[in-house]
Amino acid sequence: MKTKREDVRNIAIIAHVDHGKTTLVDELLKQSGVFRENQEVAERVMDSNDIERERGITILSKNTAVHYKGTKINIIDTPGHADFGGEVERVLKMVNGVILVVDAFEGAMPQTKFVLRKALELSLPVIVCINKIDRPEARPDDVIDEVLELFIDLGASDDQLECPFVYASAKAGVACLDLSDPQQDMKPLFETILEYIPAPEGDPEAPTQVLISTIDYNEYVGRIGIGKVDNGTISVNQDMILVNHHDPDKQQKVKISKLYEFDGLSKTEVKSATIGSIVAISGISDISIGDTLCSPEKAEAIPFQKISEPTIAMQFIVNDSPFAGQEGKYVTSRHLRDRLFKELNTDVSLRVEEMENTDSFKVSGRGELHLSVLIENMRREGYEFAVSKAEVLYHTDENGKKLEPIETAYIDVPDEFTGVVIEKLGQRKGELRNMGVSNGGYTRLEFSIPSRGLIGYRGEFMTDTKGNGIINTSFDGYEPYKGDIQYRKQGSLIAFETGESVTYGLYSAQERGTLFIGPGEKVYSGMVIGQNGKTDDIELNVCKTKHLTNTRSSSADEALRLTPPKILSLEQALGFIDTDELLEVTPKTLRIRKKILDSRMRKRSMMK
């Protein structure tokens, strides 16, 4: 018989990037007594990955739990970016309600639509938390209207439209139900969760069923499956059957060696858990997302959201440049292979294939951001390698027609830059679907655009909008191929010889275009040192020094004025490289180079 478990609430937090979701979770942790009074706490404790902290994005969903008035509240932090959308869909299967965090100034952002639509489709109740009410330009009343409009657009039910609104400043650690109420702590939010989010339901006497929704990995215990107990009770040393919804033939006898529940930011070992509990299970080496752990007497899989397929791919190659092995700790193909396959333990939207050439691997992911985060992580861990230009993964329909991935791009841009954005996206086969007035002199644009049209566009977009534009994308599906796109119109400036760049050589070179390097930097023949102002590639000698005579002295060099070089970020460099180029990635440096370094061989290959 189904019963409710009143001492547990399972909630997910949904928010746009940088709307204060992780800060809000930190505050709930602090006020529920997870941290000691004198304990030093890192800001945004839920973003455990360095890149997540720096970029203010959440990549992997994380679990935590707080206790309030004898009720355990399991909180799952969801990714706010569509590249990691595969995570979101699975997380929502574990919860009974969501908190939507919205910035009191920026309002409901397009990126939130993707996750919110999924939550509403699953008929989950929503608590709307209007955050950052202490911002001077906050406009909470307008934002409430925007949120309700968004709910209607997404087909919310009448019950969902009756959702409670909580005003908060996560940074100050306060919340209230009415702006005229005194603001003291987060108690109003805690109370709303207990009152509005339903308790999990299930049959504690039925055969056990636990759906694995996310995977964690630990060097000591290996793969850890995380999921909610839907029915029955799960215990340590229990014999179970592992079944997969998409592959019913996959049935395997397993034994539960260790069982954990979440408490604060850590996992606590438990002997058993029953309905509504979110548990972590170790000891099953090939447990995967979408698997159901069942009692042997009823091996029945729980229906599950299929994992989103990758849309773009890059080649990861062992670095073979003249400077190979000088800056990295892990440089061989074995190192690269082990690290990429290790990533598959936790990232289920990723694919890694070995190529015929043992030194290269084809890595496919959900988008440019997805793969750039992997590259940045590997770089920080001491890996040295090279990557090729991102390419989209095409499909074919039953008639053999070529299909390509299409995305919706949601853009907020100052009015004066609208023209240039529409023009640039038009060149990249983007179709303007919607255009409307946003707040504060901004225009909101909505484009349907091929995934390949977005490769390398973000950096260009930021330049065109002087850093004031916001672009978000979500995957739509596959459509017939839209035709060729002309990408980079400018060629590259290529170093002619190996050595150290000098002011005299760079001074001559800067007249040809934009430089990526300054004086005193090591360069090698075939390395790209800048962008040509024209369409062709030019080879330049940036290591040449002026011949000294009685009438010319080296001190005259000091009078040469160099324009500061354009230092490319990882995303900009990935967007810049062409099909005949590679990006050399080391822990210290990013270098763009030609695939064929030798000038004569390069020209010969172009003639073929």
What positions do the PLM features span?
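P-loop NTPase switch module centered on the Walker A-proximal segment
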Residues: 1-106, 146, 215-218
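Interdomain boundary/hinge elements
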Residues: 41-44, 154-165, 200-211, 240, ...
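Canonical P-loop GTPase G-domain recognition
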Residues: 125, 135-195
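Short glycine/threonine-rich beta-strand-turn micro-motifs
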Residues: 169, 355-370
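Conserved nucleotide-binding/hydrolysis modules and their immediate coupling elements
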Residues: 209-314, 324-326, 422, 490, ...
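Helix N-cap motif at beta-to-alpha junctions
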Residues: 231-233, 285-286, 365-371, 415-418, ...
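Long insertion/accessory domains within large nucleic-acid-processing enzymes
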Residues: 262, 267-270, 403, 449, ...
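A short, contiguous, amphipathic alpha-helix enriched in charged residues
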Residues: 321-344, 559, 563
